Curated annotation (Swiss-Prot):
GO biological process: histidyl-tRNA aminoacylation
Alphabetized UniProt keyword annotations: Aminoacyl-tRNA synthetase, ATP-binding, Cytoplasm, Ligase, Nucleotide-binding, Protein biosynthesis
Alphabetized GO MF terms: ATP binding; histidine-tRNA ligase activity
Catalytic activity as recorded in UniProt: tRNA(His) + L-histidine + ATP = L-histidyl-tRNA(His) + AMP + diphosphate + H(+)
Family recorded in the similarity comment: Belongs to the class-II aminoacyl-tRNA synthetase family.
EC number: 6.1.1.21
Gene name, Swiss-Prot/TrEMBL: hisS
Record has Ligase as a keyword: yes
Intracellular or extracellular location(s): Cytoplasm
InterPro entries the UniProt entry points to: aa-tRNA-synth_II, aa-tRNA-synth_II/BPL/LPL, Anticodon-bd, Anticodon-bd_dom_sf, His-tRNA-ligase, HisRS-like_core, HisRS/HisZ, HisRS_anticodon
Species name: Mycolicibacterium vanbaalenii (strain DSM 7251 / JCM 13017 / BCRC 16820 / KCTC 9966 / NRRL B-24157 / PYR-1) (Mycobacterium vanbaalenii)
Keyword Ligase among UniProt keywords: yes
Name of the molecule in the record: Histidine--tRNA ligase
Cellular component, GO annotation: cytoplasm
Principal cellular location given in the protein's record: cytoplasm
């Protein structure tokens, strides 16, 4: 029989433990708050979907679909997949529930775990945490700029400032076919392995996304989409850049950037942080004008992004910064006696109702042991009371910073705590 102590989290799947987990929550909430301030409504998506949704939406030639998805047959012998990204699921929900029949654009935001089977490394896990937004139904370069600005504002609201925005355009339907032929002509002259040649036949852009050093060297002189844009695609891209300039969002035009998903068109972008080494991406996204129609819906445009919560937290730490409060509680209550347990439990409930974070010492610990718990809790105030103190109508209130303790009337404890914490 397996010992319980031998169980560990699956490889590449992190646990988020207090008090450090408070930083994780602060990063996630900070990125979401930037989207909500811009009018994006929350959507909660299934953890798993029909496998065909991702195969069709993300692209069968991508590493995500061909190598990284967690796919299995359920008890009804249906092929389902743990979601590797958010956009396809959002588009499915928009189509299924007719959200595109109302006011456009449909503006949605979400957060949660996503799953990809890749080699685990710092901040890059098999269960990754993301915050995403999608704006669906309007083909307007001003909307592209807003989406990018929301991500930029989210990072900056956390105090992150050492990141860079790379941006390019992947063109539209009027110029991509010609560029595809030009790129394939270049690639088929190279000495490609069988799998890479297959990718070049299905979607040659995937070859430019190959991270292997020898492939980067071989494709260094490959033609880039930015040099072959149609007039309409170029005007769209130039207008996006003009809006970003007006919004004071700095960017670097990176004509060789290729995202890892097949549905991107026109505006495409990535946020990178050099403090993270070779795996420098902390988020990215782009426009996906053909995806909704490809999934069986109306032919409406869309743009969105996914930001890595784990990666953003690592970037903050690389800058020597923290996110949010790390202290678990404000007040630690230490009851010494049976009656004191009841009375301090009531006071703890009253303080929590007033918005104060309160923990209580349980288990009949000694005063010395309970005060060690108060130290470890990070609380700034300890409330100490025995049955005799309560008979006198008082509670000891101790400053954990100075060690000073004063007696406070029971009925005045809540007001005094709020005053000290303000």
């Amino acid at each position: 029989m397996t010992e319980l102590s031998s169980f560990k989290a699956p490889k590449g799947v992190p646990d988020y433990l207090p008090p450090a987990s408070a930083e994780f929550v602060a990063v996630r909430n900070g990125l979401l708050a930037a989207a909500r301030r811009a009018g994006y409504g929350d959507i909660e998506l299934p953890i798993f979907e029909d496998t065909a949704l991702f195969a069709r939406g993300v692209g069968e030639s991508t590493d995500v679909v061909s190598k990284e998805m967690y796919t299995f047959a359920d008890r009804g012998d249906r092929s389902v997949t743990l979601r590797p990204e958010g956009t396809a699921g959002v588009m499915r929900a928009v189509i299924e529930h007719g959200l595109d029949r109302g006011q456009l654009p449909v503006k949605l935001c979400y957060s949660g775990p996503f799953f990809r089977y890749e080699r685990p490394q710092a901040g890059r896990y098999r269960q990754l945490q993301q915050v995403g937004v999608e704006a669906i139904g309007v083909d307007d370069p001003a909307l592209d700029a807003e989406v990018i600005a929301v991500a930029d504002a989210g990072f900056r609201s956390l105090g992150l400032d050492g990141f860079r925005l790379d941006i390019t355009s992947l063109g539209d339907d009027s110029c991509r076919p010609q560029y595809r032929e030009l790129l394939q002509e270049f690639l088929f002259k190279l000495d490609l392995d069988e799998e890479t040649r297959r990718r070049a036949e299905i979607n040659p852009l995937r070859v430019l996304d190959d991270k292997r050093p020898h492939m980067k060297e071989m494709t260094a002189d490959a033609p880039v989409m930015l040099d072959h844009l149609s007039d309409a695609a170029k005007q769209h891209f130039d207008t996006v850049l003009a809006h970003l300039d007006a919004l004071s969002v700095p960017y670097v035009i990176n004509p060789r950037m290729v995202r890892g998903l097949d549905y991107y068109t026109k505006t495409t972008f990535e946020f990178v942080h050099d403090g993270l080494g070779a795996q420098s991406g902390i988020g990215g996204g782009g426009r996906y004008d053909g995806l909704m129609h490809q999934l069986g819906g109306r032919d409406l445009s869309g743009i969105g992004f996914g930001l890595g919560v784990d990666r953003t937290l690592l970037a903050l730490r690389a800058e020597g910064k923290t996110a949010g409060e790390t202290a678990r509680v404000d007040v630690y209550a230490v009851p010494l006696g049976g009656d004191a347990k009841v009375r301090l439990a009531v006071l703890a409930a009253q303080l929590r109702a007033a918005g104060v974070r309160v923990d209580v010492a349980y288990g009949d610990r000694s005063l010395k042991g309970a005060m060690k718990g108060a130290d470890r809790s990070g609380a700034s105030i300890a409330l100490v009371a025995g049955d005799r103190d309560l008979e006198a109508g008082t509670v000891g209130m101790k400053s954990m910073a100075t060690g000073e303790q004063v007696d406070v009337a029971v009925e005045g404890v809540v007001a005094e705590v709020l005053s000290r914490l303000s």
